[in-house]
UniProtKB/Swiss-Prot annotation:
Gene3D superfamilies: 2.70.40.10. Substrate binds at residues 67-69, 80, 84-86. Belongs to the dUTPase family. It comes from Lactococcus lactis subsp. lactis (strain IL1403). Its cofactor is Mg(2+). The gene is dut. It catalyses: dUTP + H2O = dUMP + diphosphate + H(+). Pfam families: dUTPase. This is Deoxyuridine 5'-triphosphate nucleotidohydrolase. InterPro entries: dUTPase (IPR008181), dUTPase-like (IPR029054), dUTPase-like_sf (IPR036157), dUTPase_trimeric (IPR033704).
Amino acid sequence: MKIRGFEVVTKYKNAGINIPKRSTEHSAGYDIEAAETVSFAPGEIKLIPTGLKAYMQAGEVLYMYDRSSNPRKKGLVLINSVGVIDKDYYNNPDNEGHMFMQMRNFTDEEVVIEKGERVVQGVFMPFLVADGDENQEKEERTGGFGSTGA
């Protein structure tokens, strides 16, 4: 039985995508790489594809955090500060659960992220819900990136 982890989405099956791994024994984060080379003009915001989807258990979430070296070395920041990948994003009908990294170039020069370059760290975590949450009506996920809000 699969508990939690990463899989390559169909579109990238033959693209040489690496399954994320932890760099050291005590690392919390799994290094997630760019699936394609992406160029950023000064000030530009773009989505970098990972070629990956993540599966996990109920009551768990995958947080995607910016690598600490990105602002200093690349001039890039994860624009939403933390990416939140919910359990029901996996295999959604819109994009198969393909995870993207939304980055912004805050420099005055073009910045390039190469295919295979580590961009964010994924950390699996349990989460809690508020009292009465089980009594609130929930919608079923029907879309992909950014589909649960405006």
